[in-house]
């Protein structure tokens, strides 16, 4: 499988320009559209390329998926128990406390406030991640990616809960 950054003609950095990503993606989709194929073999090849382009685009477009993918390129698998255990007990405790807070909150306004807090935390974590990858500090990038994953989980839980409160 080709490196997603290479496939889309992008520099392999975390802090990518999403507008350039989108521009490259659409240009490549047009170039390799199966309907433009001259024969069946080329059509099948274009289908595979188009599928890979979709995977690459949706992976690189998302800050968490992009971080996980970059770590994977460096040989770090977040599903490894040793890697996941890099978060401190305090950080994990805070995460579970926040999950419980969300579960026990029934006011839409309160949920919105919590969501705003976590959206700010998400932005900050993405900025920290960009720095970690820039310095090639994989240990720190791994921790920051794990934190970002927990923040995404909390935001997802918040959105579910907010739908129920409407």
Swiss-Prot record:
It comes from the Bacteria. Transmembrane segments: none annotated. Pfam families: DnaJ (PF00226), HSCB_C (PF07743). The keyword Chaperone applies. Residues 3-73 form the J domain. GO terms for biological process: [2Fe-2S] cluster assembly; protein complex oligomerization; protein folding. GO terms for molecular function: ATPase activator activity; protein-folding chaperone binding. InterPro entries: DnaJ_domain (IPR001623), HscB (IPR004640), HscB_C_sf (IPR036386), HscB_oligo_C (IPR009073), J_dom_sf (IPR036869). CDD domains: DnaJ. Gene3D superfamilies: DnaJ domain, HscB, C-terminal domain. Keywords: Chaperone. Belongs to the HscB family. Interacts with HscA and stimulates its ATPase activity. NCBIfam families: hscB. HAMAP family: HscB. Co-chaperone involved in the maturation of iron-sulfur cluster-containing proteins. Seems to help targeting proteins to be folded toward HscA. This is Co-chaperone protein HscB homolog. It comes from Rickettsia bellii (strain RML369-C).
């Amino acid at each position: 499988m080709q490196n997603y950054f290479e496939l889309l003609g992008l520099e392999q950095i975390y802090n990518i320009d999403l507008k350039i990503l989108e521009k490259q993606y659409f240009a490549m989709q047009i170039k390799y559209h199966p309907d433009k194929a001259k024969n069946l073999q080329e059509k099948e090849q274009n289908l595979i390329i188009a599928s890979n382009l979709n995977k690459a685009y949706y992976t690189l477009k998302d800050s968490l998926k992009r971080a996980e993918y970059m770590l994977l390129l460096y040989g770090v698998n977040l599903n490894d128990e040793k890697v996941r255990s890099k978060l401190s007990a305090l950080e994990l405790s805070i995460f579970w406390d926040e999950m419980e807070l969300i579960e026990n909150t029934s006011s839409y306004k309160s949920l919105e406030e919590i969501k705003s807090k976590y959206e700010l935390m998400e932005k900050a974590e993405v900025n920290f991640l960009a720095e970690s990858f820039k310095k090639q500090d994989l240990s720190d990038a791994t921790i920051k990616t794990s934190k970002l994953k927990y923040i995404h989980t909390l935001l997802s839980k918040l959105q579910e809960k907010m739908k129920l409160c409407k």
